[in-house]
């Protein structure tokens, strides 16, 4: 089950990341998958889904859909290329938007 979710997540990540263009040198594809993954993870974690769904989606699909390593690499490349503003903006946007997404998902389920 986890492997099936991993295949789905990796395929979705490639599809989305390759179609979302950079915005002001910010790798918006990675930001998009991390934000969507954070929201879906929060929705499933804070709801009462069966354990099998959690394994398939949270561990399998979202584990391969979201990507911290790509975020770290792309952020490092911004710094290496001397794009200091984009470097800091990328870090800020990834962390803050993903936390905001989790917070909104949590609040939506609590209403």
Swiss-Prot record:
UniProtKB keywords: Cell membrane, Ion channel, Ion transport, Membrane, Metal-binding, Sodium, Transmembrane, Transmembrane helix, Transport
Catalytic activity: fluoride(in) = fluoride(out)
GO biological process entries: cellular detoxification of fluoride; fluoride transmembrane transport
TM spans (from-to): 26-46, 53-73, 91-111
GO MF terms, alphabetically ordered: fluoride channel activity; fluoride transmembrane transporter activity; metal ion binding
InterPro entries recorded: FluC
Places the protein is found: Cell membrane
Regulation of this protein's activity per its record: Na(+) is not transported, but it plays an essential structural role and its presence is essential for fluoride channel function.
Recorded topology in the membrane: Multi-pass membrane protein
Binding site for Na(+): 63, 66
Gene Ontology CC: one annotated term: plasma membrane
Matching Pfam families: CRCB
Function: Fluoride-specific ion channel. Important for reducing fluoride concentration in the cell, thus reducing its toxicity.
Family: Belongs to the fluoride channel Fluc/FEX (TC 1.A.43) family.
Record-given protein name: Fluoride-specific ion channel FluC 3
Organism field: Methanosarcina acetivorans (strain ATCC 35395 / DSM 2834 / JCM 12185 / C2A)
């Amino acid at each position: 089950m986890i492997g099936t979710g991993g295949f789905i997540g990796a395929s979705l990540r490639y599809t989305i990341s390759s179609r979302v263009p950079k915005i002001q040198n910010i790798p918006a594809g990675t930001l998009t998958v991390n934000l969507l993954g954070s929201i879906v993870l929060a929705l499933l974690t804070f709801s009462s889904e069966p354990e099998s769904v959690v394994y398939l989606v949270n561990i399998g699909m979202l584990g391969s859909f979201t990507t911290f390593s790509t975020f770290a690499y792309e952020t490092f490349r911004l710094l290496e290329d001397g794009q200091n503003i984009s470097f800091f903006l990328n870090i800020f946007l990834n962390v803050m938007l993903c936390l905001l997404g989790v917070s909104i998902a949590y609040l939506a389920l609590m209403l």
